From Swiss-Prot:
Protein name per its UniProtKB record: Spindle pole body component SPC97
Primary location group: nucleus
Keyword Isomerase: no
Stated role: Involved in microtubule organization by the microtubule organizing center, the spindle pole body (SPB). Probably part of the microtubule attachment site at the SPB.
Entries under Pfam families matching the protein: GCP_C_terminal, GCP_N_terminal
């Protein structure tokens, strides 16, 4: 061979700022295609049988070079290979004139050199921090294997035998490679590399935004049937590089594929344990301390507020419900199926509970003796992923987190006492009479029609409320935090938003389709357009059609509401959603109490006012006005009191009893949240607050107008009898007579007139008869709607059923009662 002079110097690269941790820092060797050092000896000249050993020795020497990523004389890189270009494919070409048998051996052995070069290129690239700690550690494991195992075998066995054994052949070279586990392990590493590379390429070539949207829609469809508190908030973003669990999942799959090969499984498990060390640390810290130390976004839990300075103690914010997500892109294999939602929920919830404890106590870590349960560090990730080990480990951590969390809330913050105070205020228990006392003292102001710009009257109400609160026990935190407000929306409007008791979409609207329009969105832009359209229709009232009663001006009582901004950390259990439900329940009770007070006040008029107690009326007035008014008033009063009794005793008491039972031996924080939200939801969705509200509003309106009519009857009754008229002509009746003169065109009082009295009697009888007829019809409709026979889910043995039956038999008119019983 003729030696050529080639400039072959090793030197450091000039620009090394962006080179990964294990990246190449020196220049590449000269290529044969551009700078050949030798002029190769022709293989044709050594193809004779007696020269075959010489050719074999040359080929073996080339193969030893190829196995460490270098080209030889007769086995070279392709001419277009450029080592500085990472996108250039790595391929070797074999001399055409090589002995066919040597060429066959060479093709089989060359692939190990190709794999060595590809894996070398991979660990140089993946050692960058942008690929995350798991893939970075895998890059280190590749490098360690190539240097400590692969190259060691080449140097200590193959090169030594080639140099010292005279008859060392190409067959022996292949045999030694196959006898060791090196080739099998190299093959496994290369297969894993291919899987990771394929995943990276798919992410690079796919449209990430569309993939994100598809994942988001899948999550919406899959989670639509899950319980509110068991839903897991997913971050459906598809990241450009697979990280964390996405890499570990590939290793887990490879272990499953090689279960029949014990040595391969042991190698893969050891490799998996090594590359998962940082991940195990993150998992352990999250499940035992609620600490999320994820600098490269590869852990399954994602903190949406990381790096933000928002106040976590803001009572109006639901940060603890929305701060943490599960990255769907980096889930482990055992957490990736639809059946694993419960496991993911526990993992997410465990860290959140512990984070709340640390933030509340302002401590960096939770002492290990805070619970009776001891959690061991994760030292064998592969073993943790086998069978149900992960589920058992998470259950143990979840139980410990709940124990610490509940201990803080029940012993430290006295949660039971706080909830009792809320029940007293919002559910009408004990101290709730203070709210009712405020209602009684301000009946006049609350009867006036609500005006958003009339702040003077409402300031007076606020002052009265503050005076009432100053007399309260200062140790009652909830009472001190209680605020009175006037909502711009009436109670019926609020209920229509939350319970959809009114038909929200006209018949000709496309939203009446069986499927939700959002589910047919094609991308995020399309979804935004649909949501904007829905919001616009809601704001303009397009969905409410002919339900004008929603927007009819009403008394201030329909706008009155009480609110509490629950402080942190109590707002984690008593969320803003719970407080809105508390508000609605109390607003409904206030409306009932308001009309009950109206009826009580008019009862005083009916039974204490001289004009109503007068016994000298004619038979017609006694029977068809006085008696008919009292009977109708009694029916209205009985209806309101019956509904109040049913709502308090059969609806509220039942749910409060269930809540108190849950608080006695709490084991899970989510169970308390579910019971509280579920109990309030059951109260809110009771028929009194749902489909019966429109009928109740009609009845309330009739009651209000009839009470107003009774108030106006004092002067009118004095005009129906001459003796009563003369008796009250002076003194108290003076003002009423002036009003009567005004109503008669300002003429002077001409005394008792029988014709006018008879005409007034007829008008009063007609009004009372019409009011009684309308009330009776509303009552019949109410009882028909309340009838439980039309519901398949109705349980006749339940407490609620007994209450409904009592209400039916109590308020239904006699004829309707018999008809209802026959039906």
């Amino acid at each position: 061979m003729e030696i050529k002079e080639v400039d072959d110097r090793a030197e450091l690269l000039r620009y090394t700022n962006n080179i990964p941790l294990l990246g190449k820092l020196v220049n590449h060797q000269p290529l044969w295609s551009t700078n050949p050092k030798l002029k190769s000896f022709s293989l044709e000249k050594i193809s004779a049988p007696d020269q075959r050993r010489v050719q074999e020795a040359l080929v073996v020497k080339d193969l030893l070079n190829v196995l460490i990523g270098l080209e030889g004389t007769y086995i070279r890189y392709f001419n277009d290979y450029e080592p500085s270009d990472p996108e250039t494919p790595i391929e070797f070409k074999i001399a055409k004139k090589m002995d066919p048998s040597f060429k066959t051996f060479s093709r089989r052995i060359v692939r190990y050199g190709k794999q060595y070069m590809i894996l070398t290129r991979a660990y140089e690239k993946w050692s960058d921090t942008s690929f995350g700690m798991v893939l970075q550690r895998f890059a280190y494991e590749i490098r360690r294997f190539l240097e400590d195992v692969y190259l060691k075998t080449l140097v200590e066995r193959l090169e030594r035998d080639f140099n010292k054994v005279p008859n060392f052949s190409i067959r022996e070279l292949e045999q030694i490679i196959n006898e060791t586990e090196v080739n099998k392990q190299m093959e496994l590493l290369y297969n894993i590399y291919e899987e990771i590379f394929r995943e990276i390429e798919e992410r690079r070539t796919n449209q990430s935004s569309q993939e994100d949207f598809n994942n988001f829609m899948d999550s919406m469809k899959n989670e639509s049937s899950l319980h509110l508190r068991l839903m897991v908030a997913f971050d459906t973003t598809v990241y450009p590089v697979p990280k964390g669990g996405a890499i570990l999942k590939i290793f887990q799959q490879k272990i499953l594929e090689n279960l029949g090969d014990r040595s391969s499984v042991m190698f893969l498990k050891k490799l998996l344990n090594n590359i998962s060390q940082d991940y195990c640390t993150m998992l352990y810290e999250w499940l035992t301390q609620g600490i999320l130390n994820d600098p490269y976004q590869e852990f399954m839990t994602y903190d949406d507020l990381e790096g933000k300075t928002d106040n976590i103690f803001d009572t109006r914010d639901r940060a603890w419900d929305t701060q943490y997500f599960i990255r769907k892109d980096v889930l482990l294999r055992d957490c990736d199926s639809e059946e694993d939602k419960n496991l993911l929920f526990k993992m997410l919830r465990t860290g959140i509970l512990l984070k709340v404890v640390r933030a509340s106590l302002q401590i960096p870590t939770i002492p290990s003796n805070s619970s009776d349960i001891t959690i061991q560090e994760i030292n064998d990730f592969a073993d943790l992923m086998e069978g149900s080990n992960l589920e058992l480990y998470v259950d143990k951590c979840y139980s410990r987190a709940n124990e610490i969390f509940l201990k803080l809330f029940f012993q430290g913050y006295d949660l039971i006492n706080v909830l009792k105070h809320l029940q007293q205020i919002f559910l009408g228990y004990q101290s709730g009479h203070n709210v009712l006392k405020f209602l009684t003292k301000n009946m006049g102001e609350l009867t006036k029609h609500y005006r958003n710009d009339n702040n003077a009257n409402y300031d007076k109400l606020l002052q009265n409320f503050e005076l009432e609160r100053q007399s309260e026990n200062p140790n009652n935190l909830m009472r001190q935090l209680l605020m009175i407000q006037f909502d711009t929306e009436t109670l019926p409007q609020v209920l229509s938003h939350y319970l959809q008791i009114y038909p929200e979409v006209p018949e000709n609207n496309s939203a009446n389709d069986d499927s939700d329009p959002l589910m047919h969105a094609n991308n995020f832009k399309n979804m935004n357009a649909i949501l904007f359209d829905e919001l616009s229709k809601e704001r303009t009232g397009a969905y409410h059609g002919s339900n004008l009663e929603l927007y009819t001006p009403k008394s201030a009582i329909y706008h009155l509401k009480f609110d509490i901004n629950i402080p942190y950390p109590l707002n984690i259990i008593i969320s803003r959603t719970c407080m809105i439900k508390y508000q609605i329940i109390l607003r409904y009770q206030l409306v009932l109490q308001y009309h009950s007070r109206l009826l009580d006040e008019t009862w005083m008029d009916l039974n204490k006012t001289p004009s109503w107690k007068y016994r000298g009326y004619s038979h017609t007035v006694k029977r068809r006005i006085v008696r008919a008014t009292r009977v109708l008033h009694a029916k209205m009063n009985h209806f309101i009191k019956t509904i109040m009794e049913y709502f308090n005793q059969n609806v509220i008491d039942k749910e409060v009893y269930s809540l108190e039972k849950c608080y006695r031996n709490p084991t899970l924080a989510v169970a308390i949240q579910n019971e509280l939200e579920g109990g309030l939801t059951n109260i809110m969705t009771n028929r009194c607050l749902s489909d019966l509200i429109p009928l109740q509003l009609q009845i309330f309106d009739i009651v209000y107008k009839f009470c107003k009519f009774i108030k106006s009857m004092r002067a009118k009754l004095c005009q129906l009898d001459p003796v009563l008229y003369e008796k009250h002509k002076s003194g108290m009746m003076k003002t009423l007579n002036e009003g009567y003169r005004t109503n008669n065109g300002g003429q002077e009082d001409v005394g008792y007139q029988e014709d006018a009295a008879l005409e007034l009697i007829q008008k009063l009888i007609e009004y009372i008869s019409n009011a009684s007829s309308i009330f009776r019809k509303c009552l019949i409709n109410f009882t028909q709607e309340l009838s439980t026979e039309k519901f398949d889910f109705y349980d006749s043995s339940s407490v609620d059923a007994a209450g409904i039956e009592r209400v039916l038999y109590s308020i239904v008119p006699p004829r309707s009662a018999s008809a209802s019983s026959q039906r």
